[in-house]
């Protein structure tokens, strides 16, 4: 058992939404990267409907951190208990609770509690963890509150879709993945990418800033964190700085082989920024138009990238 001092924090917010809606967003951890600004990606490793084990990636004080978390959901009391089973230093232990309480008048009190210890309990390390917990907790509560309070038209704000390209049977799937992985080369390979800066301080964790061109020639700057799984042929990402029309944007590149060839797939999930619709698309524009615009713009660029990945793999076979 740890001998370090236990540090405790509590953050709460009142949400103008039913308690069931708020609890549902907390319970759906796999979609947290779409709901919570700090969260990059969540992999569900195992679950029985109540107990679950999750691998999580999130930003903390400007760094990308990863850990495994065990959670116990209790829909009856609207509480979710969590414990990091493999915390990343300087964290030694991390436990906590999400508590959802129905208030008179139909609003909800959402409380997030953390108990943690720090290796060696050095003041600078304790300060680092406290700042990360405080910053992320505030961002998570604010993001959830903002989304939950628009629950009546949640389905209009959120959209998910995918595009795919079939690759020839003789083209190695590894070359398709290689093209998608080597994003630092994209400015000289992909016409709609005019600038891309990429760092990979930890293997498979890429941080990048990119300028892309739209069909009308306008440039958009985005920043992203990408988590790469080469053995599974997957690259997942979260945009940490999005275009004006998008509140949040997550996605995945995947390369899947079968007996007759390879399919390269691009998946997107987006939360629209409702108050930017008319500013971006013009007076009178609505969410339906915004959905079409985002679907077309993201789909066009993704498909172009997939086609170039296909050509990269197939041309290597021809030239070989």
Question: Could you tell me what each predicted segment is?
Answer:
Residues 80, 98, 163, 167, ...:
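A broad, low-specificity signal marking well-ordered, structured residues that form hydrophobic/aromatic
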């Amino acid at each position: 058992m740890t001998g370090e001092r236990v540090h405790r924090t509590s953050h709460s917010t009142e949400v103008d939404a039913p308690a069931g809606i708020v609890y549902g967003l907390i319970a759906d951890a796999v979609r947290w990267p779409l709901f919570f600004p700090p969260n990059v990606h969540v992999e569900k490793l195992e679950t029985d409907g109540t107990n679950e084990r999750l691998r999580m990636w999130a930003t903390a004080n400007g760094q990308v951190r990863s850990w495994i978390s065990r959670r116990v959901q209790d829909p009856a009391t609207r509480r979710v208990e969590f414990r990091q089973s493999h915390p990343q230093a300087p964290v030694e232990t991390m436990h906590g609770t999400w508590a959802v309480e129905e208030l008179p008048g139909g609003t909800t009190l959402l409380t997030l509690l953390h108990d943690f210890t720090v290796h060696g309990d050095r003041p600078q390390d304790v300060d680092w963890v406290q700042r990360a917990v405080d910053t992320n907790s505030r961002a998570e509560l604010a993001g959830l509150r903002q989304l939950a309070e628009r629950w009546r038209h949640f389905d209009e704000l959120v959209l998910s879709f995918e595009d795919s390209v079939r690759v020839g049977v003789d083209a190695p799937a590894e070359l398709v993945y290689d093209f998608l992985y080597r994003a630092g080369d994209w400015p000289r390979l992909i016409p709609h990418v005019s600038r891309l800066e990429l760092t990979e301080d930890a293997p498979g964790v890429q941080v990048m800033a990119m300028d892309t061109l739209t069909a009308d020639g306008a440039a958009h700057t985005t920043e992203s964190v990408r988590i790469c799984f080469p053995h599974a042929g997957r690259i997942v990402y979260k945009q940490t700085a999005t275009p004006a029309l998008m509140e949040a944007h997550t996605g995945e590149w995947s390369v899947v082989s079968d007996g007759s060839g390879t399919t390269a797939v691009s998946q997107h999930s987006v939360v629209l920024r409702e108050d930017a619709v008319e500013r971006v698309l013009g007076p009178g524009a609505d969410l339906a138009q915004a959905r079409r615009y985002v679907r077309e713009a993201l789909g066009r660029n993704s498909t172009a990238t997939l086609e170039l990945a296909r050509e990269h793999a197939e041309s290597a076979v021809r030239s070989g």
